[in-house]
Amino acid sequence: MLSNELETCLNSAFQVAREGKHEFLTVEHLLLAILDTPRVKEVLKACGGDVPRLAAELREHIEQSTPRLPDGDEREVQPTLGFQRVLQRAVFHVQSSGRKEVGVANVLVAIFSEKQSHAVFLLNRQDVARLDVVIYISHGMSKIADERGETKAALVTRYSRDHQHPLMCTLEET
């Protein structure tokens, strides 16, 4: 059900939290873990994100804001409700779309539903929006301009007859 890549990321997030003696495993831990994957890097760059800066800001937030277990306390790291909801949303979305495997891109989209999380705040601060991520994952349409200064979305609009429906082209184009 979970892709190998996602399982590796989840293990990495738990390991980081355990080594840091963090009491909780948060949405920020999860986003930081999936940032290391090629797919998430590609998606965020296409949506205008600065991955190294985002990673640094997440690390800083985790270090400053995550409660730590006292020395000698051997309790296991506990995932927050937000962390659990993100994974549940990703699984539900994949199941409802008839697919079998949950990947890191599904988790990235699900993170945006945790609107009160610092992870979403940092993504939004870089003007990375859920819609941009979904459009890129679904259609490969980047919000970053090509060498001519046009985005794929702008090209679709320019070449559509009514500037809203890309499948309705003018006669000259057919």
Region spans (language model):
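Histone-fold recognition with a strong bias for associated Lys/Arg-rich disordered tails
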Residues: 1-174
